Design a protein with these regions (language model features):
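Glycine-rich, phosphate-binding/catalytic loops in enzymes
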Residues: 22-27, 110-113, 147, 182-183
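C-terminal substrate-binding subdomain of Rossmann-fold SDR/epimerase-dehydratase oxidoreductases
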Residues: 122-262
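A conserved pocket-lining segment of Rossmann-fold NAD(P)-dependent short-chain dehydrogenase/reductase
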Residues: 50-68, 92-107, 117-141, 165-167
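Short aromatic-enriched loop/helix-cap "lid" or pocket-rim segments at secondary-structure transitions
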Residues: 18-22, 105-109, 177-179, 204-205
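Feature marks short, surface-exposed loop/turn motifs that line or immediately flank catalytic pockets
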Residues: 13-15, 101, 170-172
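N-terminal Rossmann-like NAD(P)+-binding domain of SDR-like oxidoreductases, especially those catalyzing
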Residues: 1-98, 229, 236-237, 250-251, ...
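Conserved active-site helix of classical SDR/Rossmann-fold NAD(P)-dependent CH-OH oxidoreductases
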Residues: 75-82, 115-119, 148, 175
Protein backbone atom coordinates (compact mmCIF):
# COMPACT_ATOMS: atom_id res chain seq x y z
CA UNK A 1 0.00 0.00 0.00
CA UNK A 2 1.39 3.40 -0.98
CA UNK A 3 1.40 5.94 1.84
CA UNK A 4 0.45 9.33 0.40
CA UNK A 5 0.96 11.50 3.49
CA UNK A 6 1.31 11.18 7.27
CA UNK A 7 -0.11 13.70 9.74
CA UNK A 8 1.20 13.33 13.29
CA UNK A 9 -1.22 14.33 16.06
CA UNK A 10 1.03 16.22 18.46
CA UNK A 11 0.33 18.68 21.26
CA UNK A 12 1.24 22.12 22.55
CA UNK A 13 2.57 20.20 25.57
CA UNK A 14 5.90 19.96 23.71
CA UNK A 15 6.59 23.59 24.70
CA UNK A 16 6.49 23.12 28.45
CA UNK A 17 6.15 26.66 29.77
CA UNK A 18 7.35 28.00 26.41
CA UNK A 19 9.40 31.16 26.05
CA UNK A 20 9.21 34.02 28.56
CA UNK A 21 10.49 37.57 28.39
CA UNK A 22 12.26 39.54 31.11
CA UNK A 23 12.31 43.33 30.74
CA UNK A 24 15.97 43.39 31.81
CA UNK A 25 17.42 40.14 30.45
CA UNK A 26 15.27 39.41 27.41
CA UNK A 27 13.82 36.05 26.26
CA UNK A 28 14.50 32.77 28.05
CA UNK A 29 13.14 29.24 28.41
CA UNK A 30 12.14 28.73 32.06
CA UNK A 31 12.46 25.62 34.17
CA UNK A 32 9.27 24.16 35.67
CA UNK A 33 7.88 25.77 38.80
CA UNK A 34 9.26 24.01 41.85
CA UNK A 35 7.08 22.29 44.49
CA UNK A 36 8.33 24.85 47.01
CA UNK A 37 7.25 27.72 44.77
CA UNK A 38 3.78 26.25 44.25
CA UNK A 39 3.32 25.49 47.93
CA UNK A 40 3.98 29.18 48.66
CA UNK A 41 1.40 30.23 46.03
CA UNK A 42 4.05 31.89 43.87
CA UNK A 43 2.15 31.03 40.73
CA UNK A 44 3.92 33.17 38.13
CA UNK A 45 7.30 32.35 36.59
CA UNK A 46 10.34 34.49 37.27
CA UNK A 47 13.46 35.39 35.32
CA UNK A 48 16.23 32.86 35.89
CA UNK A 49 18.76 35.71 36.37
CA UNK A 50 17.05 38.46 38.37
CA UNK A 51 14.08 36.53 39.82
CA UNK A 52 11.61 39.19 38.71
CA UNK A 53 8.22 38.04 37.41
CA UNK A 54 8.49 37.57 33.64
CA UNK A 55 5.91 37.73 30.85
CA UNK A 56 4.87 34.69 28.79
CA UNK A 57 5.24 34.81 25.01
CA UNK A 58 2.97 33.02 22.58
CA UNK A 59 4.19 29.48 22.00
CA UNK A 60 6.19 29.50 18.77
CA UNK A 61 7.08 26.34 16.87
CA UNK A 62 10.84 26.69 17.37
CA UNK A 63 10.77 26.89 21.19
CA UNK A 64 10.08 23.32 22.31
CA UNK A 65 10.95 22.60 25.94
CA UNK A 66 9.05 19.49 27.15
CA UNK A 67 9.05 18.61 30.84
CA UNK A 68 6.89 15.54 31.46
CA UNK A 69 6.75 12.11 29.88
CA UNK A 70 3.69 12.94 27.79
CA UNK A 71 5.30 16.04 26.29
CA UNK A 72 8.60 14.24 25.65
CA UNK A 73 6.77 11.36 23.96
CA UNK A 74 4.88 13.77 21.69
CA UNK A 75 8.04 15.56 20.59
CA UNK A 76 9.74 12.20 20.03
CA UNK A 77 6.83 11.11 17.82
CA UNK A 78 7.17 14.29 15.78
CA UNK A 79 10.91 13.92 15.28
CA UNK A 80 10.62 10.24 14.44
CA UNK A 81 7.83 10.75 11.92
CA UNK A 82 9.35 13.81 10.25
CA UNK A 83 12.78 12.15 10.11
CA UNK A 84 11.52 8.87 8.67
CA UNK A 85 9.29 10.77 6.28
CA UNK A 86 12.33 12.60 4.94
CA UNK A 87 14.41 9.43 4.66
CA UNK A 88 11.73 7.38 2.91
CA UNK A 89 10.20 10.13 0.82
CA UNK A 90 6.85 10.10 2.64
CA UNK A 91 5.27 13.57 3.00
CA UNK A 92 4.82 14.15 6.73
CA UNK A 93 3.35 16.98 8.82
CA UNK A 94 3.07 17.42 12.60
CA UNK A 95 0.15 19.36 14.08
CA UNK A 96 0.47 20.63 17.64
CA UNK A 97 -3.07 20.96 18.90
CA UNK A 98 -4.06 23.37 21.64
CA UNK A 99 -6.90 22.33 23.98
CA UNK A 100 -9.39 20.93 21.48
CA UNK A 101 -13.06 21.04 22.49
CA UNK A 102 -16.57 20.67 21.13
CA UNK A 103 -19.24 18.04 20.45
CA UNK A 104 -18.47 14.39 21.22
CA UNK A 105 -15.82 15.21 23.80
CA UNK A 106 -15.86 12.32 26.25
CA UNK A 107 -18.19 12.70 29.22
CA UNK A 108 -16.56 9.79 31.01
CA UNK A 109 -12.82 10.43 30.73
CA UNK A 110 -11.70 12.07 33.97
CA UNK A 111 -8.82 13.76 32.14
CA UNK A 112 -10.73 15.12 29.14
CA UNK A 113 -10.40 18.70 30.29
CA UNK A 114 -11.98 21.87 31.56
CA UNK A 115 -14.97 21.90 29.21
CA UNK A 116 -16.35 18.56 30.38
CA UNK A 117 -15.43 19.17 34.03
CA UNK A 118 -16.88 22.68 34.35
CA UNK A 119 -20.02 22.06 32.30
CA UNK A 120 -20.80 18.74 33.97
CA UNK A 121 -20.18 20.24 37.42
CA UNK A 122 -22.43 23.20 36.70
CA UNK A 123 -25.26 21.06 35.32
CA UNK A 124 -25.17 18.74 38.33
CA UNK A 125 -25.07 21.53 40.91
CA UNK A 126 -21.44 21.06 41.94
CA UNK A 127 -19.07 24.02 42.40
CA UNK A 128 -16.43 24.69 39.77
CA UNK A 129 -13.09 23.93 41.43
CA UNK A 130 -10.43 26.32 40.12
CA UNK A 131 -6.76 25.57 40.72
CA UNK A 132 -4.08 28.08 41.67
CA UNK A 133 -5.63 31.57 41.54
CA UNK A 134 -7.62 31.06 38.32
CA UNK A 135 -5.52 33.56 36.38
CA UNK A 136 -3.53 30.92 34.51
CA UNK A 137 -4.27 31.14 30.78
CA UNK A 138 -5.00 28.56 28.13
CA UNK A 139 -5.72 28.33 24.41
CA UNK A 140 -9.00 26.68 23.35
CA UNK A 141 -9.80 25.61 19.79
CA UNK A 142 -12.98 24.14 18.31
CA UNK A 143 -12.85 20.62 16.91
CA UNK A 144 -14.24 21.89 13.59
CA UNK A 145 -11.26 24.21 13.19
CA UNK A 146 -8.89 21.35 14.01
CA UNK A 147 -10.53 19.19 11.34
CA UNK A 148 -10.13 22.01 8.82
CA UNK A 149 -6.45 22.34 9.74
CA UNK A 150 -5.91 18.64 9.12
CA UNK A 151 -7.60 18.85 5.73
CA UNK A 152 -5.52 21.88 4.76
CA UNK A 153 -2.14 20.30 5.49
CA UNK A 154 -3.30 17.04 3.92
CA UNK A 155 -3.87 18.81 0.61
CA UNK A 156 -1.14 21.49 0.75
CA UNK A 157 2.34 20.42 -0.34
CA UNK A 158 3.90 23.46 1.36
CA UNK A 159 3.09 21.93 4.77
CA UNK A 160 5.31 18.88 4.25
CA UNK A 161 8.19 18.44 6.66
CA UNK A 162 6.91 21.05 9.11
CA UNK A 163 5.26 21.27 12.53
CA UNK A 164 2.36 23.69 12.98
CA UNK A 165 0.41 24.99 15.95
CA UNK A 166 -3.36 24.59 15.76
CA UNK A 167 -5.13 26.84 18.26
CA UNK A 168 -7.01 30.09 18.68
CA UNK A 169 -4.03 32.23 19.64
CA UNK A 170 -6.25 33.85 22.29
CA UNK A 171 -5.43 33.93 26.01
CA UNK A 172 -8.34 32.84 28.21
CA UNK A 173 -7.96 32.60 31.97
CA UNK A 174 -9.60 29.76 33.86
CA UNK A 175 -11.73 32.29 35.76
CA UNK A 176 -12.92 33.79 32.46
CA UNK A 177 -13.82 30.32 31.26
CA UNK A 178 -15.79 29.62 34.46
CA UNK A 179 -17.71 32.89 34.09
CA UNK A 180 -18.65 32.05 30.52
CA UNK A 181 -19.90 28.62 31.62
CA UNK A 182 -22.05 30.34 34.26
CA UNK A 183 -23.41 32.78 31.67
CA UNK A 184 -24.29 29.96 29.27
CA UNK A 185 -25.98 27.67 31.78
CA UNK A 186 -27.86 30.48 33.48
CA UNK A 187 -28.09 29.14 37.02
CA UNK A 188 -26.30 30.00 40.25
CA UNK A 189 -23.02 28.30 39.42
CA UNK A 190 -20.56 28.56 42.29
CA UNK A 191 -16.79 28.90 41.94
CA UNK A 192 -14.38 27.53 44.50
CA UNK A 193 -10.69 28.52 44.59
CA UNK A 194 -9.28 26.45 47.47
CA UNK A 195 -5.62 27.32 46.89
CA UNK A 196 -4.81 23.94 45.36
CA UNK A 197 -2.67 23.14 42.34
CA UNK A 198 -2.07 20.22 40.02
CA UNK A 199 1.45 18.89 39.78
CA UNK A 200 2.97 19.36 36.34
CA UNK A 201 0.56 22.07 35.17
CA UNK A 202 1.93 24.94 33.10
CA UNK A 203 1.09 28.46 34.17
CA UNK A 204 0.35 29.81 30.69
CA UNK A 205 -0.05 27.92 27.40
CA UNK A 206 -1.22 29.93 24.39
CA UNK A 207 -0.03 29.13 20.87
CA UNK A 208 1.07 31.40 18.08
CA UNK A 209 -0.86 30.37 14.97
CA UNK A 210 0.83 32.69 12.47
CA UNK A 211 2.72 29.86 10.75
CA UNK A 212 -0.42 27.90 9.86
CA UNK A 213 -2.22 31.11 8.97
CA UNK A 214 0.48 31.55 6.33
CA UNK A 215 -1.01 28.55 4.52
CA UNK A 216 -4.48 30.09 4.56
CA UNK A 217 -5.98 28.57 7.72
CA UNK A 218 -7.60 30.52 10.53
CA UNK A 219 -10.02 29.51 13.31
CA UNK A 220 -13.66 30.25 12.55
CA UNK A 221 -15.20 29.50 15.96
CA UNK A 222 -14.54 31.03 19.37
CA UNK A 223 -14.93 29.84 22.96
CA UNK A 224 -18.59 30.86 23.06
CA UNK A 225 -19.22 28.64 20.02
CA UNK A 226 -17.37 25.78 21.70
CA UNK A 227 -19.61 25.91 24.77
CA UNK A 228 -22.80 26.35 22.73
CA UNK A 229 -22.00 23.34 20.56
CA UNK A 230 -20.94 21.22 23.54
CA UNK A 231 -24.10 22.07 25.49
CA UNK A 232 -26.31 21.31 22.49
CA UNK A 233 -24.60 17.95 22.07
CA UNK A 234 -25.03 17.13 25.77
CA UNK A 235 -28.76 17.77 25.46
CA UNK A 236 -28.88 15.27 22.62
CA UNK A 237 -27.07 12.60 24.65
CA UNK A 238 -29.73 12.77 27.36
CA UNK A 239 -27.56 12.64 30.46
CA UNK A 240 -24.60 13.83 32.48
CA UNK A 241 -22.37 11.38 34.36
CA UNK A 242 -22.16 12.05 38.11
CA UNK A 243 -18.44 11.33 38.32
CA UNK A 244 -16.88 14.74 38.85
CA UNK A 245 -16.35 14.42 42.59
CA UNK A 246 -14.93 10.92 42.16
CA UNK A 247 -12.37 12.24 39.65
CA UNK A 248 -11.39 15.12 41.94
CA UNK A 249 -11.04 12.78 44.93
CA UNK A 250 -9.00 10.35 42.87
CA UNK A 251 -6.54 13.07 41.83
CA UNK A 252 -6.16 14.22 45.43
CA UNK A 253 -5.56 10.68 46.66
CA UNK A 254 -3.00 10.11 43.89
CA UNK A 255 -1.08 13.24 44.85
CA UNK A 256 -1.87 15.02 41.57
CA UNK A 257 -3.85 17.77 43.32
CA UNK A 258 -2.03 19.33 46.27
CA UNK A 259 -2.80 22.14 48.71
CA UNK A 260 -0.65 25.25 48.91
CA UNK A 261 0.24 26.84 52.25
CA UNK A 262 -1.07 30.22 53.41
Amino acid sequence: MKICKVIVASSQAVYGEGQYFCQEHGPFLPVPRSPQQLQRKLWELSCCKCDRVANPSLLAEQHTNPYNQYAVSKLAQEKTALGLGWIHGIPTVALRYSITQGPRQSLFNHYSGICRIFVSSALTGSPLVIYEDGLQTRDFVHIDDVVNANMLVLENDAAEGHAFNVGSGIRTSVVEYARLVRDKIGNQVEFRIPGEYRTGDNRHSVSSISKLKGLGWSPKKNLSDILDDFLNWIQQTGGIPHQIRDAYSHMKEAGVVLAAFD
